[in-house]
A protein has these predicted regions:
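Core catalytic lobe of class I
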Residues: 1-307
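S-adenosyl-L-methionine
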Residues: 46-71, 310-343
Length: 343
């Protein structure tokens, strides 16, 4: 191999320690991951636009270009991060039946800046004892629209869920597809283990530089320069899944922890930039944006989920005003006006 046994052992130990240090698995609960109940009689109605601090959420269909244009008001997004429904996760009351049609309709209307990045979280579907590559047609279509299939990441969700899974290993990951038309350098958000140190030298002053093809040790290209404080994340996103029990604590699907969109927002946007979320759901990306100083422009077709997103935001940021754009009235005032009681 060109390495001594001691050098190989040193490299393996360092790699193992780095993986442990860089893992973003979190054992503590995040209060922001708590989701309010879905209301039987929602306050929100189709066409409503809620101003939520620096963010906007419209109750409307992201496949409708007029809805997206109204929401964006001429603004362009630096990032689209979303987790679309798949595998009959959500009941759209027969508004959209075909998944490809849904995805093409939504992604044809992306209000992106020229260097905008599009990251989409999807999971596996098994039917008749096979993995169904349901995304294939949509991936091909994205390419015809000028969106490069730039990268493919893995979201490591932590330990597998209990169950026998019909003979399969316990699921513990999902995918994040990355599209763009222009590359944008990812932000360096991962702390470096040896920050500030000149780690290319051992204690005795000898070098740990890689050997060349002929077996000789090459020079360190950054000799005399300390290791940087942070680095670009790797392609495995290590974040624990939402801890709620689907069907018990959570009565709507595709709930992911706030830490996931927070990671993506911090990786591919700067504070103050716009993020487009076409499937707002329970408002997870809104919370991540508030936490990181980004501005979300979101659509959600179902009025009850709009209410959930608003209430969830309010329970985490009660000091941030939430008003109906058309009237300037607060969410509570609109609830009394429409339902006769506070929401």
């Amino acid at each position: 191999t060109g390495f001594t046994n001691e050098e190989i052992e040193e490299l393996l130990v360092g790699a193992e320690q780095a993986l442990q240090d860089e893992s973003s698995d979190e054992t503590e609960d995040d209060a922001a991951d708590e989701v309010p109940d879905t209301p039987a009689n929602p306050v929100s109605r189709p066409g409503d636009i809620w101003q939520i601090g620096a963010h906007r959420l419209i109750c409307g269909d992201a496949t409708d270009l007029a809805v997206v244009r109204t929401l964006m008001a001429g603004e362009q997004a630096s990032l689209c991060f979303t987790s679309p429904p798949y595998g009959n996760q959500r009941d759209y009351t027969n508004t959209i039946i075909d998944w490809d049609a849904l995805m093409r309709g939504v992604f044809a209307n992306l209000p992106m800046a020229p260097n905008g990045q599009v990251l989409v979280n999807l999971g596996l579907i098994h039917r008749d004892n096979e993995v169904i590559p349901y995304w294939d047609g949509w991936l091909d279509w994205m390419r015809t629209q000028g969106w490069r299939r730039f990268a493919w990441y893995v979201w490591d969700q932590g330990p597998g869920l209990p169950g026998d899974w019909n003979g399969r290993l316990a699921p513990s990951f999902e995918f994040v597809f990355h599209f763009n038309r222009q590359a944008r350098q990812a932000n360096k958000i991962v702390p470096c283990k040896f920050a500030g140190q000149e780690t290319h030298l051992r204690k005795d002053g000898s070098s740990t530089a890689m050997r060349k093809a002929d077996g000789t040790i090459g020079g360190w290209t950054a000799a005399g320069q300390p290791t940087q404080e942070t680095k670009i994340p790797d392609s495995v996103i290590r974040i624990m899944r939402h801890k709620g029990k689907i069907g018990q604590d959570i009565d709507h699907p595709a709930v992911f922890p706030v830490a996931l969109p927070q990671f993506v927002l911090e990786s591919y946007t700067d504070a103050g930039e716009f993020v487009f979320e076409p499937f707002c759901g329970s408002g997870t990306t809104l919370l991540a944006a508030e936490r990181t100083g980004r501005k979300v422009r979101a659509t959600e077709i179902a009025p009850e989920y709009v209410d959930v997103a608003v209430k969830r935001f309010q329970q985490n940021y009660p000091e941030v005003p939430v008003t109906l754009v058309s009237t300037g009235k607060t969410f509570s005032a609109v609830a009394i006006e429409r339902l006769g009681a506070p929401a």
